[in-house]
């Protein structure tokens, strides 16, 4: 079971990295030499950022399954609403005087 979870986590990371690479296609199109050069320069800057982001995604460790947050969530899911007593049918004397 743990190997399957690790494999699914790796596949999720690889899909995200692939999506990042697809969002930055190599620049093509007409234009002057300086326009093409600037497009390539900006593309190369984005490419370096994507590589750094992909590296951090791939190397970032998955949080442990029994982290304090997960334990807290499991504890909160086990809570139920208790039966509350019926509300009083008449107001106390001090509140009746305050309303008038």
UniProtKB/Swiss-Prot annotation:
Coiled coil: none annotated. Residues 22-42 are annotated as: Disordered. A motif (Nuclear localization signal and RNA-binding (RRE)) lies at residues 35-49. Residues 22-34 have a biased composition (Polar residues). Transmembrane segments: none annotated. Residues 16-24 are annotated as: Homomultimerization. InterPro entries: REV_protein. One of its GO terms (molecular function) is DNA-binding transcription factor activity. It is found in: Host nucleus, Host nucleolus; Host cytoplasm. A motif (Nuclear export signal and binding to XPO1) lies at residues 71-82. Its main location: host cell. GO terms for biological process: mRNA transport. Keywords: AIDS, Host cytoplasm, Host nucleus, mRNA transport, RNA-binding, Transport. GO terms for cellular component: host cell cytoplasm; host cell nucleolus. Escorts unspliced or incompletely spliced viral pre-mRNAs (late transcripts) out of the nucleus of infected cells. These pre-mRNAs carry a recognition sequence called Rev responsive element (RRE) located in the env gene, that is not present in fully spliced viral mRNAs (early transcripts). This function is essential since most viral proteins are translated from unspliced or partially spliced pre-mRNAs which cannot exit the nucleus by the pathway used by fully processed cellular mRNAs. The RNA-binding motif binds to the RRE, a stem-and-loop structure present in incompletely spliced viral pre-mRNAs. This region also contains the NLS which mediates nuclear localization. These overlapping functions prevent Rev bound to RRE from undesirable return to the nucleus. When Rev binds the RRE, the NLS becomes masked while the NES remains accessible. Homomultimer; when bound to the RRE. Multimeric assembly is essential for activity. This is Protein Rev. It comes from Human immunodeficiency virus type 2 subtype A (isolate ROD) (HIV-2).
